[in-house]
Design a protein with these regions (language model features):
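Surface-exposed loop and turn segments in beta-propeller and other repeat-based domains
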Residues: 75-78, 123-126, 169-217, 259-273, ...
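Long, internal scaffold/assembly segments composed of regular secondary structure
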Residues: 204, 215-333
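Short beta-strand elements that form the blades of beta-propeller/WD-repeat-like
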Residues: 37-59, 85-101, 108, 133-157, ...
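Bacterial Sec-dependent N-terminal signal peptides
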Residues: 1-24
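Structural motif
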Residues: 55-60, 103-110, 151-159, 241-249, ...
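Start-of-domain marker
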Residues: 20-84
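Blade-loop segments of beta-propeller domains
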Residues: 68-104, 122-129, 263-274
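Repeated scaffold domains used in trafficking and secretory/extracellular systems
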Residues: 31-40, 78-88, 125-137, 178-179, ...
Length: 495
């Protein structure tokens, strides 16, 4: 065991040696109540940062080398607008969409750097018997998506080039959605069935973006939405252990298609089949599925029509013959990390938790992580425990913090067990060393630098309130407001 702990320590020491580059630093004074937002303009190779406090919104436009091109400032919208939930951009016009906490109030803020113009206006939006599904910006267009209660009808409120939101109704009643018992149900019933509070049903769908490598804490969620295609929205549902449902909505004509990709079948009374758990992850045109019991682990790769590409089966006493790293358990911090000695520990622990798989592609290879994530809850002052999140409040991130910040710090207050794997384009195992990703470098940098943390009294945890993370020109960037020195800093991390 000591040897394993030493190996984990050597791994961390190796990570510390990776350097990050500070690409930009400039003077900036912001008040206490502050938040941040970024827009990436790939066409013109620009980054626009919106740096907001309780009184004003300061927008700064950078070129691709982070030289400041120009800036605009205007008043922050009314107090009822709590956060930025998305944006749209077209030919030099930028529109930020602000929303109240309950999303009953929506406002739009306009910026044009060439004309040096800004203005703010309310948007009249009546949500009738609707629940918010997700707020997304795809291909420079903002989508506010709702579902009509007790139906399979989605409503899309879509931004146009003038900052308006136009409604499009998508009726999915002809499609057969499944609940956790693998029975046919409305989409609304399937989505709210697993909610924490039955008296206040909510729709919780995790956004998987290509902005940074997704963590297991996000990919282990039951419902996910993928936005890696510019003209298609893809939802996955893993509420039952029989199959993964894939819902695709074409964003040009809003036609929809639902497919079901089966998980491996486990015979009744075999491998503790009644304790099976499963999940999935999409990448390119493939679906990666994990299914586990206390005695067996299946990892299956198929195309999104269900045609199998490869499958790995591991029994609890067997070595995982397709892994490229040790099996790690990480509790709350990358510094609280140990190596698990026995394969059965891995299979047992992920089955006792929320199993998941995550993957990203680099230089033609698929870098894959298999494991699980579980909330660490605080049962009493000074006490800790494991659970599903009922005893503590998880960090909440609006669009201002973006998917990537929530992703980067998502292992905070988590018990995560994982191993890394490397595959070729056909998902054959590649016996090669896995290099440290930009995501892991940024995560370690975050934990090593106390200046990046804002100490708060909420459950005694650190909230990274002054950070943004974004991908630009194939690099990962971390932006931070240093309130002590009144400076804004941007760091870069390479693969």
């Amino acid at each position: 065991m000591l040897k394993k702990i030493l190996l984990a320590s050597l791994f961390l020491n190796g990570l510390v040696s990776f350097s990050q580059e500070i690409v930009k630093e400039f003077d900036l004074t912001l008040e206490k109540k502050r938040d941040y937002f970024q827009v990436i303009n790939e066409t013109d190779k620009e980054v626009i940062l919106f740096l907001n406090d309780k009184e004003k919104v300061s927008s700064i436009r950078f070129d691709e080398k982070f030289n400041i091109k120009d800036s605009l400032s205007t008043e922050r919208p009314e107090k009822k607008y709590k956060e930025i939930v998305g944006y749209t951009q077209h030919e030099g016009n930028y529109f930020l969409f602000w929303a109240s906490e309950d999303r009953k109030e929506i406002g739009v803020q306009y910026f044009n750097f060439i004309k040096k113009e800004t203005h703010t206006a309310p948007i009249n939006l009546e949500l009738k018997k609707e629940k918010i599904v997700k707020e997304l910006t795809i291909n420079n267009t903002f989508y506010l998506i709702t579902i009509v209660k007790n139906t399979s009808i989605l409503k899309f409120y879509i931004s146009d080039h003038n900052g308006n939101l136009n409604e499009k109704k998508v009726d999915l009643s002809h499609l057969k959605f499944k609940n956790s018992s693998n029975q046919t149900a409305s989409l609304y019933s399937a989505l709210i069935e697993l909610g924490v509070d039955p008296f206040r049903p909510t729709v919780q769908i995790e956004h998987i973006s290509n902005g940074s490598q997704p963590s297991l804490a996000l990919s282990s969620k039951t419902f996910k939405v993928y936005t890696y295609k510019k003209d298609e929205l893809i939802f996955t549902f893993d509420s039952n252990r029989v199959s993964t449902d894939i819902l695709k909505i074409n964003l040009n004509d809003f036609t929809a298609d639902l497919k079901s990709v089966k998980q491996p079948e486990i015979a009744q009374h075999e491998y503790y089949s009644n304790m099976a758990k499963s999940n999935s992850f999409l990448i390119d045109d493939k679906i990666l599925q994990i299914k586990t019991t206390p005695d067996v682990l299946f990892f299956t790769i198929s195309d999104q029509n269900g045609n199998r590409i490869n499958q790995f089966k591991t029994l609890r006493e067997e070595e995982i013959n397709y892994k490229s790293s040790d099996v790690f358990q990480e509790i709350s911090s990358i510094h609280n990390k140990k190596v698990l000695d026995k394969p059965k520990q891995f299979i047992r622990k992920i089955n006792n938790s929320n199993p998941g798989v995550t993957c990203y592609k680099l230089n033609g290879l698929y870098y894959t992580v298999i494991g699980s994530s579980q909330d660490i809850i605080r049962s009493a002052p000074g006490g800790m425990g494991m659970g599903g999140g009922f005893g503590g409040a998880p960090a909440s991130f609006g669009f201002t913090s973006s998917y990537t910040i929530g992703n980067l710090i998502s292992y905070k207050d988590k018990n995560v067990v994982y191993t890394s794997c490397l595959f070729d384009s056909n998902f054959n195992y590649v016996a090669d060393k896995i290099e440290t990703s930009a995501f892991e470098k940024a995560r370690l940098f975050l934990e090593e630098n106390e200046d990046l943390k804002e100490r708060t009294s909420i459950f005694g945890k650190d909230l990274y309130k002054d950070l943004i993370v974004f991908k630009f020109n194939s690099l990962l960037y971390l932006g931070n407001y240093n309130k002590q020195n009144k400076k804004y800093q941007i760091f870069s991390f390479t693969e």
